[in-house]
Amino acid sequence: LLIDMADPGVTTKKITLISGKSPFCETFFDNVKVPKENLIGEENQGWTIAKKLLQHERNFISNFGLAGGGGSSTKGIVGIAKKYLGEENGMIADSDFRAAVTKHKMKEHAFGLTLQRANDEGAKASAASSIFKFYGTEHNKERYELMISALGNKGVVWSGDQADDNEKDITRAWLRTKANSIEGGTSEVQLNVIAKRVLDLPT
């Protein structure tokens, strides 16, 4: 059913996140009446339509696996690591951290090629969207975990003057990545969808 948010009985309440922002809200329906003309599709088939919408949403969210963290030398993961961990011969000084970043960037490149291949093949929103959404959001969380690690004690500040604006932005973005793996269906839900609809595993 399409419901007009201005209808009597429809109210919303902001949800304050750990970041202090409120981009989401909860909606309440108190004795709301909706005309039958607002029915989309067939009766009792709303979940079928909702699943299609979720597939498109998951496709969109999966791109965070590529877009998050920035690609510039000053804001990207490599630039952050060089600034806070030091640089030797143009490379990140800490060899263990350099290896972790290299592994991350290789996975990111492979993920980008996979998304491009799916696009070139004309793939539409499907259960495979769950694969892209799961991997993309988990990869984005990993990216920010690495950046927070490189920041050291600067990575636990999101207000005040103990960190600069860029450092605080990274911390806030790191917190935001936790929501990426919840919205559009949690990572656990995606794994269930992959098992059932992609791999056809027994339930």
Regions found by a protein language model. Give the residues of each.
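FAD-binding core of flavoproteins
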Residues: 1-79, 196, 201-203
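Alpha-helical interface subdomain recognition
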Residues: 55-203
